[in-house]
Amino acid sequence: MNRELAEIGKKTRIDSIKEVSLDFYKDERGDLTVAEEHSLPIKIARIFTVRAQQESNRANHAHKECSQLIFCVSGELVVVCDDSFKKSTLILNNPSDGILVPPGIWLEQTYKKNNSIRIDIPRRPGKML
């Protein structure tokens, strides 16, 4: 982790990561997760997906000025969060449950199942550290 991130981390702590739950519906046909503008804690600037193989590591960066929502819509994702004072490990494996990560939190993500898919919804395009 670099010095600039450590400075940002003085203001942003792991404890400020928030759990986010989307509406979820299940019946005999399958599952449906719904994300609408009013149900998201941030305004959407862009959406991107990442699919990776088992034990692939991604992210390994922090956003300097941008909050982001992270969901694992298929498979399982282990997210290690680091604010330069404390580390926390979170497991995402339900498409309706995600996390809102504030700027300055270093993220390392490991895909625990083949073809796991992550959706990221950043508040705005941001600079990575």
Regions found by a protein language model. Give the residues of each.
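Non-catalytic, conserved peripheral segments adjacent to functional cores
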Residues: 1-99, 114-129
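Beta-rich strand-turn-strand
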Residues: 106-113
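Short beta-strand-centered segments at strand-helix junctions
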Residues: 101-104
